Amino acid sequence: MKKRLVTLLAGLLTVLSMGFGLAQFSDVPAGHWAKEAVEALAAKGIILGFPDGTFRGNENLTRYQAALLIYRLLQQIEEELKTQGTSPTMEALAPEDLEALKNAVQELAAELASLGVRVSALEDSAATKEDIARLEAMIAELKAQPMPEPGMDQAALKDLMDRVEAASIAADTALAQAQQLAERLDALAQDVEGVKGDLAGLRSQVEANADAIQALNELAVLLNQDVLSLQDRVTALEKMVSGGQELPDLEQFATKEDVAAVQEFAAALRSDLVGLSDKVSKLEEQVAELNKVRYSISGSLSATYGTVVTDTGTNFDIDRLFPGNAFSTGTYGSFSSSVQAGDSNQGNISGGSASLTFGVKVAQPGTSGVNVSEASATLQVPAAFGTAYTSAPTIRLNAASVKGNVDGQAFSVVYSRAVSSFKFNDYLFANDNDSEPANPRQGMVATFSATKFPLAPEVTVVAGVAGPDATKDTAPALNGNYFGIRTAVKPFSALNLALNYATNLGNRSAIGVDGGLELGPAKLSGLWVSSQTPGSPFADFFDNTLSDWAYYAQAEAKLGPLSLSANYHAVDPQYADGQAGMSENEDTTYYGGEKAGAPYGADTRGLGVSASVGFGPVTLKGYAESEGDYNLAPGSVNDAWGVAATLGSFRGFSLTGFYNAAYTGGNGYFSLTTAVDAIAPGVTYYYTIENQKYSSSWGVRVAHDGKAEDALIPTLNLTAQYATYYVSGHTDIQVYADLAKPFKLAILSLSPGFRYHSFAGAGSAPTYTTLKGGVQVSTDPLLFGLSLDGAVSYRRTQYTNNPSNVTTYELYYRAGVKLQDFLAPKLNFSVAYAHYEGDQLAGTGLPVVGSGNQAFNFARDRVYRSPDPIAAPWLATPGTQAGKLDGFYIEAKYYDLTVAYGEFVLDDLNGTNPNFGRGFKISYTVKF
């Protein structure tokens, strides 16, 4: 059949080559015996050659190429059949020959597929290197012998081939076992990592076994390479057999004894692998036993030496010059920005501390009785050394915790020496956000999930003692012993309820309930807290004239594109400063409300509704609120309502129009008594609030979002707004822009920004115009890791009325050089110079500290000091503060080692009142 196929193909190709122009290939030499056939097939489109114009006739034909040639040939035949005309091809081939040709092609495709399977099987097989070497030697010896007479023993050859294949399969099985063991060893290594201290001896065994497995894997790779070579030889033998040629007797090439030796070697290899597997299994059992309980030790050591002083004792801020410098005192208390606190006169800042944490963790704790899953304890030496010698530094238990279960029900107990953290609800025992702390609390917090009890309550118990901090809060929310218990239940999935009791011995006691309910698209939530002083009967908790109440009810609903919300609330004035609720989060003495999380302020009673709905690109919003003091005293009620419509987003642009109305002096809800420009500027209303809520205003705003996917100008944020405060007749225009991410220009990264603000005040209000611009720039690392960075920000506010012809300005700039991996990897060095100055700023004297950091916030006027419209634009009046601050700063860091030095001077604009400051600091922290 194969001979007939070859004959038919040759004839067909010859016929196809008739009557067509000849194609030329650059590498088919003239006079070559196949040149005519090659050119004829190329002209017919069956052979196309390579893109470089060559035929590459000496390269092997792949199965893919063969399939492509046959496919093109069949296409040619089918096209000629469809024409139902005459052609050289059709005339030269008889119908029976054509049918035979198709059948032969299909048979050839099947044989090619079968050959692919056999080749893949041979590629996946493996044999030992020694056996292959022996077979190769025998083949070489056989080739050297003269060819015997025809008549080889076909049965012997088949037997030899069967034994070789069996040996390959055995070796392949051994290789698979070795690979499986290698994977098991990798997983084992991860477990061993967690118990390094207890498995030092076992690790050496595992590493030795891993080396052995690696060696076996490498051997298997070499064997596979040898098998590929042997495969080529076997294929050649198969071709000789299929071609009808007789081969020499291969008994003398490889006897049955030789093959048996190969099988014995494979069996020995398999036995060794089984033994190794047993060892690994034993190691895994030992690791599992050790992993039942894991122990850990961690801690840190830190030391600082240095001093920061000024020659005059003036404690001025240096964060304005160098953000994130090593001398910064950061933010604390009511300071929301580090520029509001002085840094330059800290004095001796030397000291050291140490901490050590011991931990234990049970991998699979029991579920019957009391079971501990993990526990930890932290010892601390807060003043390992300080500014004065002490022979016995204080060592204290700083924190401890235990987690586990009781009959499968989770529990936890946490102890803290000074910052015990817990919160029952917004108005009771809210003490989880004052980490400095201003109100030190030493105590425990225990939780228990009683899932096997009726209603599966979640119980929280807190107990401890608290006290004041003489330097921070002398009237804290908790003072003395305290205790509280909270029980939360969930009768069904949509309802949750919690009952609370809390007491601060000798000061306050309180009870409360809070919860929530979900009804389809609606959500309801609320709370009630009643607090009273000691000595009052329990019944007084339920009389709001004899106890202090805080309560609210909130409702939310979402109906398709429509969202609705409503609230009613009342908070007794005794909840101010967190007193009635025993909540340091609400402290105003030290934190100034910065930590507050309660939704409604003390001494308030009111209600409000809001709604929003979207129709395609249009969104409508509205609100209405009315609130007075807790007793709704006459004249205390403030009302506000407003609407806004936004069209967007198109290519990042949106258009918003808004209208608001604000009233004060009411005697009841929504009495709309006296229209005002804004309600409580700086408290209720502030300049950057959304759509100028709580003011009497209308306006329009166009904005472009540089982060939008379809932004017209990617990364560009642009806002332009016009607003009128119609009660007094003020008008306000602001336009500002910045980039959502730095702009890359060659080696430069640029973050520019711009602001224009014009306010025209009516009556006695000021009229002024502010221009502000700035840019932050840095370069990519240049030669030897050197890079440059800098920044500049400038604002100028010109007052033309009330007061007239007054100009206030601020200027800040910084330039620096950084060296990364300087002299050694991870050694970074930087040096910078910075300058800040201003005139006619809010306040008097020198600009010792800032009002806030707005240097590169272009939605605000100020750089570091007011005047600024944040409370209300008509309140932004200039002052008489003027001065400048200069300095240079050097810092080197190597991992957690920091060395810093800086010199600074605060002076008036004329340079006649200098205050010099100097700082030096070396600090290092080791964590283990």
Curated annotation (Swiss-Prot):
It comes from the Bacteria. Residues 1-23 form the signal peptide. It holds the Pfam family SlpA_C. GO terms for molecular function: porin activity. One of its GO terms (biological process) is monoatomic ion transport. One of its GO terms (cellular component) is cell outer membrane. It is a multi-pass membrane protein. Its main location: membrane. Keywords: Cell outer membrane, Ion transport, Membrane, Porin, Signal, Transmembrane, Transmembrane beta strand, Transport. Residues 24-84 form the SLH domain. It is found in: Cell outer membrane. Homotrimer. Exhibits a tripartite organization, with its C-terminal part forming a homotrimeric 28-stranded OM beta-barrel (OMBB), its central part forming a long trimeric coiled coil that can traverse the large periplasmic space, and the extreme N-terminal part forming an SLH domain trimer that can interact with the PG layer. Plays an important role in the structural organization and integrity of the cell envelope, bridging the outer membrane to the peptidoglyan layer. Appears to be a nonselective channel. This is Outer membrane protein SlpA. The lineage of its organism: Bacteria, Thermotogati, Deinococcota, Deinococci, Thermales.
